[in-house]
Amino acid sequence: MKINHVAIYVNNLEKTKEFYVKYFQAKANEKYHNKNTGLQTYFLSFPDSETRLEIMTRPELSGREDRAMNEGFIHLAFSVGSKEKVDELTERLVKDSFRCLSGPRTTGDGYYESVVEDCEGNLLEITE
């Protein structure tokens, strides 16, 4: 058994798609738009991964405050292959004004990682 995809709602579908394309080398499928419900989605595929990220939006979405302290979904983790790549990507995101919540650092359980927010405030863990 394996995870096929994870889906998240976002407010700005196009901006979110471009974020993952630019920083995580995602490839997007053709946008799906259900004219009856207003739902719009992209499936994003990533190099060397079979698991996809589905980003979705609809007109009636409302935001949540303090996402890190809610039950349920906490973060997505991306393995980039080395400590140097963790450092480089984290530095690039911070330079482009995305918020870094921690790291890069070695955690108590031995992982080298940083935690940043994407353009929608979703938490991303960048690991080696």
Q: What is the predicted role of each segment?
A:
Residues 9-51, 57:
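Core segments of cupin and vicinal oxygen chelate
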Residues 36, 47, 68-70, 106:
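A generic structural micro-feature
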Residues 17-18, 53, 87, 124:
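Alpha-helical elements of the RecA-like P-loop NTPase motor core of helicases
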Residues 1-2, 128:
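Absolute protein N-terminus
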Residues 3-11, 42, 64-128:
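Vicinal oxygen chelate
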Residues 48-52, 61, 83-86:
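Short, charged/polar surface micro-motifs in flexible loops or helix N-caps
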Residues 56-62, 128:
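Acetyl-CoA-dependent GNAT
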